[in-house]
Regions:
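Macromolecular interaction modules
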Residues: 1-98
Protein backbone atom coordinates (compact mmCIF):
# COMPACT_ATOMS: atom_id res chain seq x y z
CA UNK A 1 0.00 0.00 0.00
CA UNK A 2 1.35 3.43 -0.95
CA UNK A 3 2.04 5.79 1.93
CA UNK A 4 3.11 9.37 2.49
CA UNK A 5 4.86 11.61 4.93
CA UNK A 6 3.39 15.09 5.08
CA UNK A 7 5.22 18.12 6.47
CA UNK A 8 3.08 21.18 7.24
CA UNK A 9 4.97 24.44 7.74
CA UNK A 10 3.57 27.49 9.50
CA UNK A 11 4.10 30.97 8.09
CA UNK A 12 7.82 31.77 8.37
CA UNK A 13 9.07 35.04 9.86
CA UNK A 14 11.10 35.66 6.68
CA UNK A 15 9.47 34.12 3.61
CA UNK A 16 12.37 34.90 1.27
CA UNK A 17 14.99 33.33 3.53
CA UNK A 18 12.76 30.31 4.22
CA UNK A 19 12.01 29.67 0.55
CA UNK A 20 15.60 30.14 -0.56
CA UNK A 21 16.86 27.49 1.85
CA UNK A 22 13.82 25.24 1.43
CA UNK A 23 13.92 25.05 -2.37
CA UNK A 24 17.68 25.40 -2.92
CA UNK A 25 18.92 23.12 -0.12
CA UNK A 26 16.20 21.15 1.64
CA UNK A 27 14.22 19.80 -1.32
CA UNK A 28 17.39 18.58 -3.10
CA UNK A 29 18.21 16.66 0.12
CA UNK A 30 14.69 15.22 0.24
CA UNK A 31 14.99 13.99 -3.34
CA UNK A 32 17.99 11.84 -2.32
CA UNK A 33 15.97 9.79 0.21
CA UNK A 34 16.04 6.12 -0.86
CA UNK A 35 12.64 4.72 -1.83
CA UNK A 36 11.08 8.15 -2.39
CA UNK A 37 8.77 7.92 -5.41
CA UNK A 38 7.65 11.54 -5.63
CA UNK A 39 7.63 14.77 -3.67
CA UNK A 40 5.05 17.54 -4.05
CA UNK A 41 5.18 20.97 -2.43
CA UNK A 42 1.98 23.01 -2.16
CA UNK A 43 1.48 26.58 -0.97
CA UNK A 44 -1.67 27.33 1.02
CA UNK A 45 -3.84 30.17 -0.23
CA UNK A 46 -6.16 32.54 1.56
CA UNK A 47 -5.41 35.00 4.32
CA UNK A 48 -6.59 32.65 7.08
CA UNK A 49 -4.72 29.55 5.90
CA UNK A 50 -3.47 27.51 8.88
CA UNK A 51 -0.17 26.69 7.16
CA UNK A 52 2.20 28.22 4.64
CA UNK A 53 3.55 25.17 2.79
CA UNK A 54 2.84 21.45 2.66
CA UNK A 55 5.32 18.87 1.41
CA UNK A 56 4.03 15.40 0.56
CA UNK A 57 6.58 12.60 0.18
CA UNK A 58 5.32 9.42 -1.50
CA UNK A 59 6.65 5.91 -0.85
CA UNK A 60 5.48 2.48 -2.10
CA UNK A 61 5.13 1.01 1.41
CA UNK A 62 5.50 1.72 5.11
CA UNK A 63 8.69 -0.35 5.09
CA UNK A 64 10.23 1.74 2.29
CA UNK A 65 9.20 4.95 4.04
CA UNK A 66 10.73 3.80 7.33
CA UNK A 67 13.93 2.66 5.63
CA UNK A 68 14.21 5.87 3.61
CA UNK A 69 13.62 8.18 6.56
CA UNK A 70 16.08 6.16 8.68
CA UNK A 71 18.78 6.20 6.00
CA UNK A 72 21.74 8.62 6.11
CA UNK A 73 19.97 10.71 3.45
CA UNK A 74 16.77 10.78 5.48
CA UNK A 75 18.67 11.73 8.62
CA UNK A 76 20.49 14.52 6.74
CA UNK A 77 17.13 15.87 5.61
CA UNK A 78 15.81 15.78 9.18
CA UNK A 79 18.95 17.47 10.53
CA UNK A 80 18.53 20.28 7.98
CA UNK A 81 15.17 21.36 9.46
CA UNK A 82 16.84 23.54 12.09
CA UNK A 83 18.41 25.61 9.29
CA UNK A 84 15.07 27.07 8.19
CA UNK A 85 12.32 26.05 10.65
CA UNK A 86 11.72 25.94 14.38
CA UNK A 87 10.39 22.78 16.09
CA UNK A 88 7.00 24.40 16.70
CA UNK A 89 6.65 25.62 13.10
CA UNK A 90 6.43 22.19 11.43
CA UNK A 91 3.92 19.37 11.87
CA UNK A 92 4.67 15.90 10.50
CA UNK A 93 1.97 13.35 9.63
CA UNK A 94 2.08 9.87 8.13
CA UNK A 95 -0.72 8.60 5.87
CA UNK A 96 -1.83 5.62 3.81
CA UNK A 97 -3.26 6.29 0.37
CA UNK A 98 -6.73 4.75 0.11
Amino acid sequence: MAVTMIALYKEPADREKFEQHYFDTHIPLVKKIPGLQKVEVSRFTGKDAPYYLMATLYFNSKEERKAGLSSPEGQATNADLVNFATPDSVTIAFTEIV
